[in-house]
Amino acid sequence: MLQAMRAHFPIGISPRKVSKVGPRFHAHLSARGKRYRYRANLGWAMPQDERFVLSMKNTILDGEKMQLAANILTGKHDYSAFSASHGKEDTESPVKHIWRFDLVSKGKSIDFVIEGGGFLYKMVRSMVGALLDVGTGKLSPSDIKCILESRKRTEVVVSAPAHGLCLDKVFYKRILG
């Protein structure tokens, strides 16, 4: 069944597992959280097999400061400053819980791994964009704290491009058929 499903998905999207679920299961409403992975390639050439990465040729990033900033963004906070408004602000709470925000180096690339119970529109890309600015010295970890506490989106927060972002996993409540 998994192979048959894969034939209907576009290139780059590949389901890994199929499970039988009950009639009350809802793909969105039954989810308890998600893991996003954002990959930036710091080398000169893009790997041929990785189409979904941000290319930052020959960029040097301060990983220690970026992880400090990621730690500030971890926890339960109002993430309004890291959301791009798109009309849901009256119905969706800006308070979200980020369980994990880690930076994982893999050769010439760096993965931003973010897990949480919910996300606002463009929140992950905005947080990654802010951390990239910390890594290049445009912002400091204390700037990230001030931005988070301000609860206001400003031009200082620039969203990272979409092509580095991947929904890596959806965490579900126990789902039995």
Give, region by region, the residue ranges found by the protein language model.
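Structured-RNA-binding interfaces characteristic of tRNA pseudouridine synthases
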Residues: 1-177
